Amino acid sequence: MSDVPEDANAGCPGTGSAGAGKASGCAGCPNQGACATGQGPPPDADVPKIQDRFSRIKHKILILSGKGGVGKSTLTSNLARALASDPSKQVAILDVDICGPSQPRMMGVEDEEVHNSADGWTPVGIQPNLTLMSIAFLIGDKNDAVIWRGARKNGMIKQFLKDVDWGEVDYLLIDTPPGTSDEHISLVQFLLQAGPLDGALIVSTPQEVSLLDVRKEVSFCIKTKVPILGVVENMARFVCPNCAHTTLLFPTSTGGAEKMCEDSNLELLAQLPLEPALAEALDNGEDFFETNPDSTLAKSFMDLAEKVKAKLH
């Protein structure tokens, strides 16, 4: 919706709707009084810029996780490579994990710089049909901590959306921070203002402590009207690098992601194994599909990419 203020609550009905300032989602919003009297805040002048940038992006996918350390960024990078295995498709990654950007290291472009032109920021190329934008490219020292309050983080996310010159893109994967923070609310609002959002992939691990937060992530998507494409269970089992025997790594005391998806009427798109070779490839910025093309995990990522494409078309 183009009439949702930047600082509005999640689930804002829009300043021009009949429920403006009166709906349950308006409680506590700084714009509630103005909206209720028909004097809502002025329209965001950056919305048309975001709409223009995203008009050339066919599919936009959020990668979410309720908890850190479940492999969300790992999934993002390898799903992007799997989608980009089709040379006719243009794929891009937007890393909006402002305080913990890891995509540049994983994709082997940690020392690259972003170039600015009259058309905006040019994302860093990984291969001819795969590009990346991350705040890590804008920080002088990669070991410097990003200590920003919410408003500045949101401003950076907005700048990514309106100033990056992606060009024509078939699939944009957006790697988000863990949880459901202020950045997620602002990001979703900006994206919905730019047009339809294809949906979210939610990443979990099998144990209940992770699934507890996944259920909150599902609730967030429902409240913000973000479609859920499905759930990916990462580290579902361990694959021995010597004999390829698989072993359950984490307890599934409540049935794991499979049972949670069944209870929540969600689709479990993949149960990805844990392979030590992947960690080595990511640390070295290597393409896992080139170093381990016949591995169980590489095939699982390719299968996941096909399922995602089927859901989008």
Curated annotation (Swiss-Prot):
Pfam families: ParA. Its cofactor is [4Fe-4S] cluster. InterPro entries: AAA+_ATPase (IPR003593), Mrp-like_CS (IPR000808), Mrp/NBP35_ATP-bd (IPR019591), NUBP1/Nbp35 (IPR028601), P-loop_NTPase (IPR027417), YlxH/NBP35 (IPR033756). Transmembrane segments: none annotated. ATP binds at residues 66-73. GO terms for cellular component: cilium; cytosol. GO terms for molecular function: 4 iron, 4 sulfur cluster binding; ATP binding; ATP hydrolysis activity; ATP-dependent FeS chaperone activity; iron-sulfur cluster binding; metal ion binding. CDD domains: Mrp_NBP35. Keywords: 4Fe-4S, ATP-binding, Cell projection, Cilium, Cilium biogenesis/degradation, Cytoplasm, Iron, Iron-sulfur, Metal-binding, Nucleotide-binding. GO terms for biological process: cell projection organization; iron-sulfur cluster assembly; regulation of non-motile cilium assembly. It is found in: Cytoplasm; Cell projection. Gene3D superfamilies: P-loop containing nucleotide triphosphate hydrolases. [4Fe-4S] cluster 2 binds at residues 240, 243. Its main location: cytoplasm. PROSITE patterns: MRP (PS01215). Residues 1-25 are annotated as: Disordered. Binds 4 [4Fe-4S] clusters per heterotetramer. Contains two stable clusters in the N-termini of NUBP1 and two labile, bridging clusters between subunits of the NUBP1-NUBP2 heterotetramer. [4Fe-4S] cluster 1 binds at residues 12, 26, 29, 35. Belongs to the Mrp/NBP35 ATP-binding proteins family. NUBP1/NBP35 subfamily. Component of the cytosolic iron-sulfur (Fe/S) protein assembly (CIA) machinery. Required for maturation of extramitochondrial Fe-S proteins. The NUBP1-NUBP2 heterotetramer forms a Fe-S scaffold complex, mediating the de novo assembly of an Fe-S cluster and its transfer to target apoproteins. Regulates cilium formation and structure. PANTHER family: CYTOSOLIC FE-S CLUSTER ASSEMBLY FACTOR NUBP1 (PTHR23264:SF35), NUCLEOTIDE-BINDING PROTEIN NBP35 YEAST -RELATED (PTHR23264). Heterotetramer of 2 NUBP1 and 2 NUBP2 chains. HAMAP family: Mrp_NBP35 (MF_02040), NUBP1 (MF_03038). This is Cytosolic Fe-S cluster assembly factor NUBP1 homolog.
